[in-house]
Design a protein with these regions (language model features):
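Non-cytosolic membrane-interface motifs at loop->transmembrane helix junctions
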Residues: 38-42, 104-116
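Juxtamembrane helix-break-helix junctions at the cytosolic face
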Residues: 66-82
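Transmembrane alpha-helix/helix-exit interface in multi-pass inner-membrane proteins
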Residues: 17-36
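Hydrophobic alpha-helical membrane segments
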Residues: 82-99
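Membrane-water interface at the C-terminal end of transmembrane alpha helices
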Residues: 119-137
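Cytosolic juxtamembrane helix and N-cap/initiation of the first transmembrane helix
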Residues: 1-23
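Core segments of alpha-helical transmembrane spans in multipass integral membrane proteins
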Residues: 40, 44-70
């Protein structure tokens, strides 16, 4: 991995760590988990609390992804490529679900973030796979 790719990959994971902490904290702590306020979902139906609950659970998961990414950046840099690969796979699965398998009725507020994160992490992962030039042939 080149020095530039290493810095870029650490920067991307650092940013994703803080984004996931913020986004996850919001979903977990907001009274409606962001369903009504951010996504504009109708929460007047009887099982609306289930939607709020599921978004809060997703927020908890995002918090732990954020912690994991920050741990990798500061303590376990040997896992950077694995973290980027996992983010690309996760993002691809989210996009496949969102656009092909189970499209939602209303637009997902984070849909462009899903695309951008998947593309950026995929590009950085490819850069990380390039040889550093220090290898002997």
């Amino acid at each position: 991995m080149t020095a530039g790719a290493k810095k870029l990959s650490l920067g991307v994971l650092l940013a994703l760590g803080f984004i996931d902490l913020g986004r996850g904290g919001f979903h977990w702590l907001a009274p409606d988990s962001g369903a009504g306020v951010v996504a504009g979902m109708n929460l007047s139906f009887p099982n609306a609390r289930d939607v709020v609950f599921l978004l809060a659970l997703n927020g908890i998961s995002q918090i732990f992804w954020g912690i994991a990414y920050l741990f990798i950046v500061f303590r376990a840099r040997q896992l950077v490529r694995l973290a980027l690969l996992m983010e690309v796979v996760r993002g691809s699965m989210v996009l496949a679900t969102e656009y092909l398998l189970k499209p939602p009725v209303s637009p997902v507020p984070g849909r462009f973030m899903h695309m951008a994160t998947t593309i950026v992490c995929g590009g950085v992962l490819l850069l990380c796979m390039l040889p550093s030039g220090k290898q002997h042939r």
